Amino acid sequence: IKSYKWHFIPIIFGLIVAIIGIYFGIYSIGGGIRTTNQVLSNPQEIFGYKEFFGRYLSMIFTFITASAGGLVAPSIALGAVAGSIYSSFFENIPPLIFAIVGMVAFLSPILNVPITSAIVIVESTNIDYSNFVILSVISLISFFLNIFLKKIYSKIRVKLFKPTTN
């Protein structure tokens, strides 16, 4: 690309991600390993909507600029934070379970291999293999829900952008 204006796009989005990190906190930026480890090591500490929204925005802006940021680790972290938030509604169930379920549910549509997503989370979190079946079911549900929603959104897009004839 010979135009210099294209060099400013990553700089602008990089500054936006930096502002997101300042406003939403340290757990909203980065690869996601720190966030995931924090959720798994201290599940009683409930993350808020602020961290979730900040991580979601920083993941989008990093992906738009085609910067090295990935989708796998940030989506696992996003699922862990979502599970942490969701666990605040259920006091009788351990928060760690919700974090792991969120990790599987967010990873499956990204990788497009549901059973492998469940295996990756079971192996990386070192939980008991007796949970593998339920995590596989959750992974399959999120995978097929993603396929279903893609079909709906593509139909909506066709209807919205269909050329009108006069």
Indicate where each model-derived feature is located.
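Alpha-helical transmembrane segments and immediately membrane-proximal extracytoplasmic
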Residues: I1-N166
